Design a protein with these regions (language model features):
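S-adenosyl-L-methionine
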Residues: 1-12, 22
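Switch II (G3) loop of P-loop NTPases
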Residues: 16-19
Length: 92
């Protein structure tokens, strides 16, 4: 949190490691404060557990989230206000 305060905006944010619903949502919400209209989030292990699936659903439904791509092992989120809200799922 302290390091985020030193950053004006986040262009790319990779979130990995904790695998807990509450923590993942917390990290997303904290980083969301520093986004711009071209920010991309990447979340690892979105199906690691039921909690991570819940966190992924929360992230997809956030009003600032405009486009998501579910690659099963990871999720990509675009924050771009002029895009239509879309959720894609690609398995490969």
């Amino acid at each position: 949190k302290k390091k985020l305060k030193k950053i004006n905006t986040i262009d790319l944010c990779f979130i990995d490691g904790n695998h807990q619903e509450k923590s993942t949502i917390f990290y997303f919400n904290e980083c969301l404060k520093y986004t711009n209209n071209n920010t991309i989030f990447i979340f690892d292990d979105i199906y690691w557990s039921k909690g991570m699936e819940n966190a992924w659903q929360y992230i997809k439904s956030n009003k600032k989230t405009t486009l998501t791509i579910d690659l099963f092992y990871l999720g990509i989120v675009f924050i771009k206000s002029e895009l239509s809200k879309e959720n894609y799922k690609i398995r490969f």
